Amino acid sequence: MSSTPNKQAGYPRLVADIGGTNARFALETAPRVIEKAAVLPCKDYDTVTDAVRAYLNQSGATAVRHAAFAIANPILGDWVQMTNHHWAFSIETTRQTLGLDTLILLNDFTAQALAVTQTSSKDLMQVGGQKPVEFAPKAVIGPGTGLGVSGLVHSHAGWVALAGEGGHTSFPPFDDMEVLIWQYAKNKYGHVSAERFLSGAGLSLVYEALAAKQKAKPAKLMPSEITEKALSGASPLCRQTLDIFCAMLGTVASNLALTLGARGGVYLCGGIIPRVLEYFKTSPFRSRFENKGRFEAYLAAIPVYVVLSEFPGISGAAAALDNHLRNV
């Protein structure tokens, strides 16, 4: 992150969620008021600075002094080299080039975690559990392109998001079927992380492993095709795949809830679950989530929410920027 000593946190503020394919930009024009959202293809711009300038010109924004970018990358210092796109840049040099007083960067899933604190009840669908305990830790997990994992803990300064790489922890198979699937993945990849299964590619991997177990040679299917055939009843194998995927998610989510003591709730982000909402309510997820022996009652009380807001990375970046400006 980079700032000059400044002291008035003015609006509008520039907020962005930058992935390998698209960069989403918006202006925060007042506290929690997000306007003029736009999506720019990353491939159309040589540098992140070019993309920012194009958005600012398009939106007609003037006098922007503060900005925050959520980005699909670990943030380990001033230099950012995107892992899934060619953009590489210095945060401080970018701040100076754009004439900003403040520019902060944060991991995209850390931003999604912070967005949970800004999300209204209409953008949450509860799946089991009771009421959240106020100010208790919250767990945030998001199967999508990869598997994002974070947590939120409350401090005197507000909610703090935990930045980590929990999606790459080792996956724990629960039953004999999952052991077979895990063995298939281990033979293929060596280390089997939670993300190997709990992602778009992971859904395809579970499908592939089940087909191999049945000595079948099914057609190659995209994750969206697997879910479509599972929900329509067109493929029992796809339905079994989706059931196992949701059960696996229940295991990993409950492990995270126990680790954090997340009596403030578990929040499911990412692009996969919102596409199968009605199915998910009665999927194996919740029963697996609670299946923890002596801690079954503890987990049964924890509410799980599916986050439905469209651009959580944007609102999370705005929350991070606000926290930063309050504390400089």
Swiss-Prot record:
It is found in: Cytoplasm. Its main location: cytoplasm. Pfam families: Glucokinase (PF02685). It catalyses: D-glucose + ATP = D-glucose 6-phosphate + ADP + H(+). It comes from the Bacteria. One of its GO terms (molecular function) is D-glucose binding. Its EC number is 2.7.1.2. GO terms for cellular component: cytosol. GO terms for biological process: glycolytic process. Transmembrane segments: none annotated. ATP binds at A16, D17, I18, G19, G20, T21. Keywords: ATP-binding, Cytoplasm, Glycolysis, Kinase, Nucleotide-binding, Transferase. Belongs to the bacterial glucokinase family. This is Glucokinase. It comes from Neisseria meningitidis serogroup B (strain ATCC BAA-335 / MC58). The lineage of its organism: Bacteria, Pseudomonadati, Pseudomonadota, Betaproteobacteria, Neisseriales.
